[in-house]
Amino acid sequence: MKHLLRGFFIAVLYICCNFQLVLAQPMQTLPVDKNVRIGKLDNGLTYYIRHNALPEKRVEFHIAQKVGSILEEPQQRGLAHFLEHMAFNGTKNFPGDETGLGIVPWCETKGIKFGTNLNAYTSIDKTVYRISNVPTDNVSVVDSCLLILHDWSSAINLADKEIDKERGVIREEWRSRNSGMQRIMTNALPVMYPDSKYADCMPIGSLDVINNFPYQDIRDYYAKWYRPDLQGIMIVGDINVDEMEAKLKKVFADVKAPVNPAERIYYPVADNQEPQIFIGTDKEIETPSISFFFKSEAFPDSLKNTINYYGIQYMISMGVTMLNSRLAEIRQQANPPFTGASAGYGDFFVAKTKNAFGVDASSKIDGIELAMKTILEETERARRFGFTETEYDRARANYLQRVESAYNEREKMKNDTYVNEYISNFLDNEPMPGIEYEYAMMNQLAPNIPVAAINQVMQQLITDNNQVVLLAGPEKEGVKYPTKEEIAALLKQMKSFDLKPCLLYTSPSP
């Protein structure tokens, strides 16, 4: 492991000196778990195949697509999600008419239940279909599931009659999802993402489009975006990898590579100097809540498979963990200033092209101002004074304990755990070196990263610009909320808050 140690010390040097500088440094590429077969067909289709016998005689089939509602044209709003529904309503090999069973009835005759084992979801930037817990006793069932993936990839029928039938189903889903928080989110997006495609991108889409779109609009979306260079197949279970790979190559051989394909754009999110603040109320909302986001650049996909990435993710995780511990302790007070509070880090709300450190709180009906002030004070305390050695020792020990537990349980990993890892690798280039490598790496990395490095990272995550605020609360007579101007003023006051270093959270665990 000498090469790993050398790379680690370089990474820590950069990390401790300058968090942003790390992003630009070339680092050793991490290996890929040798237990998964990864390949790419000539048409651009990527596949991941792994043998795993937990549970025995079962296998998972997934197809992940690098497409979602963000790619819709204005006249197609909601059709990415509509297409997901149509994938179950007739395909080339499972027509669902007098010539043969559809996917859902065929699967249910084999014990594969719709909703439980057969399902899909559409989000802003991805669409994923799955057939789970498939019995491997019958070879023809396994082969047919592979054929279903093929049809989802390139052979959904999209018959006029079936499209019209599905409009009613989508209308009902649209109405059921039209909750108070959904309405607030829809109204908040243009404020959070001004002049951006993200301003109108929720997958449920437009009811007017759902009711009236011409058939060709959904066929155009399907032809343009469902294509092998944007698709990944994940097959994990009690199967022979060589045999499954050969079958996959044969089944997908007729799927053509696109000619002059449209560019798959990942839309950027603009920076902002002044806070972007949205305040929304709705009669269906029961309790007030407020979220503060501090935006930062997303870690480049091209650099994720490096020690840098693991080091930075570890440090951010430690900072978030320790801040959450402080918030949890405040919540245990006799008369806490909020009913709940938490910190986190990840994609900026619905956009994967920007990251954000976030802190949020919920409160009693008349307590949002106190909750807001408290979480900003704790955020500023973490930025200004950092965390203590005792806090860090506790958080690091818990982290390493979780890593060790995962390592010790590595022979008991279930199929879906591996599938989710491969989906993340395909869609977001998340590394997958395997738990053995991660265990060795983190047991060298974590003990050598000091709390000072964590504190420096927190200073850079909690920014004076790129701030976004979302306040949601009940629409009730007599209930008052802080104004946008008051929230903006409080953010500007953060650095001048009268605070002392944290003394409440330094006692060791019993």
How would you describe each model-predicted region?
Residues 1-26:
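Bacterial Sec-dependent N-terminal signal peptides
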Residues 30-60:
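Mature N-terminal segment immediately following signal peptide/propeptide cleavage
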Residues 60-132, 183, 200-206, 321-354:
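M16/MPP (pitrilysin/insulinase) zinc-metallopeptidase core fold and M16-derived inactive scaffolds
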Residues 90, 131-165, 330, 348-408, ...:
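M16/insulysin-pitrilysin zinc metalloprotease superfamily fold
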Residues 99-105, 157-175, 240, 259-273, ...:
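Acidic/histidine-enriched alpha-helical segments
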Residues 167, 181, 218-250, 466-467:
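Non-catalytic, conformational "gating/processing" segments within enzyme and secreted inhibitor domains
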Residues 232-288, 397, 401-406, 490-504:
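An aromatic/glycine/proline-enriched structural segment found at the starts
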Residues 505-510:
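Conserved small/polar residues in nucleotide/adenosyl-binding loops
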